[in-house]
Amino acid sequence: MSSAANEGCVYLFIVVLRLSSFSCVNSFIHSFTRSRTRSSYSLDERSLVSYSIVYVAMNKSSKAFQVPNKVITKEDITPLSRSHTKKADTRGTADGKNTTASAVEATPIIITTARSIDTAGSLSENATEDDGTQNGDLHDDDDDDDLESTLGYSSEPDPLFSPCHQPSFTNSTFSYSADNELPMEENHNKNNFHDSSESSIFLPQIQQSFFFGDNSKSDANNTDFWKEVNGTAEEAICLQETRQRKCSLVALHPGDATTSSNDTLGIEDFIKDDINSAEAMEPSPSSSPSSSLLDNLDYNIKLLCYRDNEGKFTLKKRKFLKNSLRSSSAISKKWKPLSKRDKLLKRAIRRKSGVCQTLSAGFGIGEFML
């Protein structure tokens, strides 16, 4: 309770001492701290703490109180624009007042981006006019340049966003490099592009006439993209070979040719034309159309049924089978009937194997479990 009372008295004295002068406060605090014998702090440390508390309480508007609390005043803010600082300096000298506050109250920084390239030309022109009218203080200009270089801001437009790779056709020369075929612009003046902001509207047309010639016209429409193109007929591709064969047959047999108005062929006509073409390729009186189809293994139509041209059902003869086996590369084995002895032997082997499997089942399971 005594320590709490002592602390309350200390805060009460601090509030009272805010109304007194600074010299009286120092002596009073020293006398008060000497009278306190139960405090754990030494005399010098206690006096230093109380002195700092009273000093901060009396001078709240000073930098000692504002900097630790992260309070930034207008005095800490430096001017950022060259033209605005010069205007503020002239007004301040005429009125006889401080110029730092007026410089801070100027308009904010204009950050040059890709969208503000057109407006950057007019801003740079105004800045150059202000520089031409006020060339008296060279020392102030150097200080402003140093300040802008340290802060990283500048009133001039950033050349990074200016399209230097595009030809501006204003007081500039072009040079062709070895690696690049397009002309590279060599600007002797950085503000050439921004001075001709009005002519930048017609820059794409000038570039097009420069690179592709005056006769080039960009008349491409959406209809050209969706223009219909005649495709290939799949039926004509499939029946191209059959038509060629039909023409060859007509040339060989002009009497058998029948005139047809339709170009498309049916399935029956397609098969007949193939059979006739096979007969024309291999003419032989003894061979029939079925035999020619069997002998030619690379033919695209196989035998559909065992009927002849008259519609009667006929089986294959043994000659055709022998011819087909000889022409094919399949290995044929002669069929031999099994004797009774072989049949009994197979049955005995099956029985023995079954008995062995039943006897050795227990041993196999035991070995598997181990």
Curated annotation (Swiss-Prot):
Q: Where is this region: Disordered?
A: 81-101, 123-167
**Glycosylated sites:** N59, N98, N126, N171, N221, N230, N262
- Protein name as annotated: Putative uncharacterized protein YGR079W
What keywords sit in the KW lines?
Glycoprotein, Signal
Q: Kindly list the organism's lineage.
A: Eukaryota, Fungi, Dikarya, Ascomycota, Saccharomycotina
Q: Point to the regions of Acidic residues compositional bias.
A: 139-148
Where does the UniProt annotation place the signal sequence? 1-27
Q: Which residue windows are transmembrane per the record?
A: none
Record bears the keyword Manganese? no
